[in-house]
Amino acid sequence: YEVPLRLVGSEMCIRDRERSFEEEVKLSGFGAAPVKAEGASISYDNAQESFTARYNHETVAMGFSITEEAMEDNLYDSLSARYTKALARAMAYTKQVKAASLLNTGFTTFNSGDGATLFSTAHNTVQGGSNSNRPAANADLNETSLEQAVIDIAAFTDERDLLIAARPRKLIVPPALMFVATRLLQTDLRVGTADNDINALNTNGSIPEGYVVNHYLTDADAFFLTTDVPNGMKHFVRTAMQTSMDGDFDTGNVRYKARERYSFGVSDPLGMYGSPGV
């Protein structure tokens, strides 16, 4: 089988790092600037720390060996090439699964730095408000739910409850929804109706980067949107994949291994929007 296509990075920032872990602090910024009366003193505001997102790097490693007898029987070249490709595929698969795990567990067990699950109706702000990056009621992917997602994202505020005019960027769907996504985003007229209405999602360019299929999503009716809010989902690379080989004196086998260190996480949950479906 071929090495999986590179999906890591389609919905997250990728950064190289040199520490055992990473921490990113979200700052509150300032409130709305007030009007200053003539001759009056200027008003001052204090920025605050909202929450801290922590990324703990994991080491992922795997290896294989070729026996001395296989090398004697001139099987080394064919086996080495095939096993090396299989090892690369195994390493890539683990990375894709770990990246998708943020989405797969984002409604249940994976928490963002503010203590709420990644997709929550209660991402509280330091000013006392809250943001919701999931629908109030679980919804399947259709015209109504996608339009509501665009509206919900537009209502995002910063930590001081100021509107940030957020917009969706890309729709992420499992294979089971790829055809639904095509009809919703790439047709000129509305789908599933005899009315001659335009497809507002398409005409308005509401999802400017279209959609991508993520084969590692485990829920067949969940869908997700990336937004233009910076510092959302991130992938930190502590050590890029390294390969090495050596011979074992006792057995005569030749051993190969691959190893890398990385982490996945979310610095700002407003970088994503998701619905688990019904």
Residue ranges and their predicted role:
Residues R6, Q48-E49, F156, M241:
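Short alpha-helical segments and helix-capping/turn motifs at coil-helix boundaries
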Residues F119-D158, A165-K170, A176-V278:
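Sequence/fold signature of self-assembling virion shell proteins
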